[in-house]
C-alpha cells in the first residue's frame, strides 16, 4: 500500500476490489490475502478455474479499463509482483481436509528456476521426497506446487505455496 495509507488500501481491497474484481468475475474460484508480519506488504492468492480466466473479456475489461477507485489505488501501489501459474499438484497432511489446510496461520512461498532438462527430476523429487518430509511435521498442513506460466518480473519457473501453522514450524528438525 502507499505510505501512510494502509487502512485506505485495505478498505479498497476488501470492500471494492474483492467483490467487484475477484468474486464478480467468472472463473475466479477464491481469493485469499496474507499480510507479512510487521510490514505493510501482502501476498494475494487467487484460485482460478484456469489461467485462461485472465484472457476472458470480462476480466480484461476490468483490468485494462479500471473504475476510478481502482485506477487511483493502483497508481499509488509500488513493488507489485504478479505470477500466473498452473497447479501441478497439491498434497495435504493426512487427517486434514483441504479446508483445514487453507486455515493455516501462515503461507510460505518458495520460488525456483528449474532448467528444462531437470524439470521431470525436480517434480519427482519435490512430490515423492521433499513434500512428504515436510508434511510429516504436524504444523505443515499443505504444499502446492505450481508451474509459472506468466510473470512480472520473470525470473522463476516454479512456485511452491506451503500452508503452515506459523513461523515456529520452520524451526522443526523435520524441516
Regions found by a protein language model. Give the residues of each.
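Macromolecular interaction modules
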Residues: 1-175
Amino acid at each position: 500500500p502507499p505510505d501512510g495509507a494502509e487502512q485506505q488500501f485495505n478498505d479498497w481491497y476488501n470492500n471494492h476490489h474483492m467483490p467487484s474484481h475477484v468474486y464478480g468475475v467468472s472463473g475466479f474460484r477464491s481469493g485469499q490475502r496474507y499480510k507479512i508480519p510487521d510490514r505493510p506488504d501482502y501476498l494475494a492468492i487467487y484460485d482460478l478455474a484456469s489461467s485462461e480466466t485472465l484472457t476472458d473479456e470480462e476480466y480484461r475489461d476490468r483490468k485494462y479499463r479500471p473504475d476510478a477507485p481502482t485506477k487511483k489505488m493502483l497508481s499509488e501501489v509500488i513493488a507489485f509482483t504478479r505470477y500466473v501459474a498452473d497447479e501441478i499438484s497439491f498434497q495435504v497432511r493426512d487427517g486434514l481436509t483441504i479446508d483445514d489446510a487453507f486455515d493455516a496461520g501462515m503461507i510460505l512461498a518458495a520460488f525456483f528456476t528449474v532448467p528444462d532438462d531437470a524439470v521431470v527430476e525436480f517434480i519427482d523429487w519435490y512430490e515423492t521426497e521433499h513434500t512428504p518430509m515436510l508434511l510429516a511435521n504436524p504444523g505443515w498442513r499443505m504444499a502446492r506446487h505450481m508451474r509459472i506460466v506468466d510473470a512480472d518480473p520473470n525470473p522463476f519457473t516454479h512456485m511452491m505455496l506451503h500452508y503452515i501453522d506459523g513461523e515456529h514450524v520452520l524451526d522443526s528438525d523435520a524441516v
